[in-house]
Amino acid sequence: MKILIMGAFGFLGSRLTSYFESRHTVIGLARKRNNEATINNIIYTTENNWIEKIVEFEPNIIINTIACYGRHNEPATALIESNILMPIRVLESISSLDAVFINCGTSLPPNTSLY
């Protein structure tokens, strides 16, 4: 089974990646490099061809664990880009594949951030 984990360096994504790596072919999707990460196969969204790399990988399962909630005082546009537009781009890119998309959501108290 080929699995794409979106948000592979995050709390949930890193744990799911560790769990699935020994049983399946896993590629992570991340916004920026993390020198402490132990994940072997990563697609960075800063690369010009990141969408094409996802399509070439042909995942059977995509697990979205992306969560930008403003802990670094990101503006609302960054939250919308990460939490809404990024998953939509991935969904549109894999529409021709027979893949399952699993979306994981989180919530925070309203006084925490714009999230």
Which residue stretches match the model-derived regions?
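Conserved Rossmann-fold NAD(P)-dependent oxidoreductase catalytic core, especially the SDR/UDP-sugar
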Residues: 88-115
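N-terminal Rossmann NAD(P)H-binding glycine-rich loop of SDR-like oxidoreductase domains
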Residues: 2-23
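A generic structural motif
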Residues: 22-27, 31
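SDR active-site strand-loop-helix element
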Residues: 6, 29, 65-66, 101-107
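Rossmann-fold cofactor-recognition segment
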Residues: 31-49
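NAD(P)H-binding glycine-rich loop region in Rossmannoid oxidoreductase-like domains
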Residues: 46-82, 109-111
